[in-house]
Amino acid sequence: MKIGMVSLGCPKNLVDSEVMLGIIKDKQLDITNDPADAELIIVNTCGFIESAKEESISTILQMAQYKEEGSCKYLIMTGCLGQRYADELFESMPEVDAIVGTDSFTDIGWVIDQVLAGKRVKHLQKLESKNVQAPPRMLTTPDYMAYLKIAEGCDNCCSYCIIPQLRGPYTSRPYDEVMAEARSLAAHGVKELIVVAQDTTRYGEDLTGKLLLPQLLRDLNELEGIKWIRVMYLYPNNFTDDLIAAFAECDKVCKYIDIPLQHASDRLLESMNRYDTRAQVEELLAKLRERIPGITIRTTFIVGFPGETDEDFAELMDFVEKQRFENAGVFQYSQEEGTVAGAMENQIEPEVKENRYHELMALQAGISEEIHQEREDEELDVIVEGFDEENPALAVGRSYHEAPDIDGNIFIENAAELEVGQMVRVRILQGFTYEMVAELV
């Protein structure tokens, strides 16, 4: 039996896919990267916003074609979309043989057995019975990097977000379990450890009543073999002085702050059920830049949130222009059923959202280009991720300033002798909006 896996959505979902692949491997089943060759296909879906739902449905229908044209006999849906719409999808998509919820994916071995026995399965567990899974994992990332998921669920309850309903309340993984997995990843040659959760700053609060991320970073910093520790999804309301100190003092912790801010208008922040005002965020950002030399700050913003006026948007533009973030992602608000914001009456017209999106993106593009040009002649350590298809002597890599998949790349000239996963010292020659060009030092 050959099994194929298609993983959609965020890195946290990818970790779930890797856990499922590890379970499948333990069952002595073959795993293939080619869906056309698979007899059973698992699609780990995303259901966060409308575009993600559309991609998930499209992928499932595409995989279902292999039942007619390929080797596929069975199709299993896992992840957030299945959790959110299990009843409707089970009825409307007969080509799907099983739907598995976000809290029951570790039962994938049992689900496969049921499907192979000819049963059609809808397997959902109550989210309160959280199963925050330890290894085994079968890594699908390059050998030199891996994600380390430290918690599941979310307690922030932002008014636009469906995640707490899909993933349940915030549940930290046991500290010793997280460290054991990190040591295992280091022993397998991982150089870049990327710490993820829906909210990494809240880690440990439900275990001990204390925020444990600062101590976790200090302990991870002692692991042999690990070169970079990158932390994603840091929320501003739990960014303590101790956490700032951990970033500043731990040499392996990347001076890279991924902190979703979403807006700068106090009125909209309150409507979003965010915990901070613009003034509080500005105070935190000033403290971060003062105490962490060489810091890069990445953030995300939502435009077109219900009730966003021209004045609100102008305030956001002013905030971004003054803060000069190194990297920022911009999203058009997606009206999601089941959320507080989705039921608000003052929804923004799509054309207005689109215009504001392009205006903010253009502003940020100019800022990013200026920052990249300011880095010309600077020396950086870069991890090699591959080579340009048209010019094999041009290596492609990242420094601590860039997270995989979401930030830009650094192109290294005359680098044909380098190897993927190698860390090298480079000098920046030219900076552009999303990329930089460098030479070996």
Which residue stretches match the model-derived regions?
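Conserved, mostly hydrophobic/aromatic
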Residues: 178, 195, 231, 259, ...
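Proteins enriched for Cys/Gly/acidic motifs involved in redox and nucleic-acid/cofactor modification
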Residues: 1-203, 242, 257, 279-290, ...
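Terminal RNA-binding accessory module
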Residues: 343-441
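Conserved SAM/AdoMet-binding glycine-rich loop
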Residues: 75-79, 84, 89, 187-311, ...
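Active-site proximal loops enriched in glycine and acidic residues that flank catalytic Cys/His/Asp
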Residues: 197, 233, 261-263, 299-303, ...
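Short, hinge-like loop/turn segments at secondary-structure boundaries
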Residues: 93-94, 115-118, 211-213, 247-248, ...
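Radical SAM enzyme [4Fe-4S]-AdoMet core and its adjacent flexible, acidic
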Residues: 10, 204-225, 271-272, 335-366
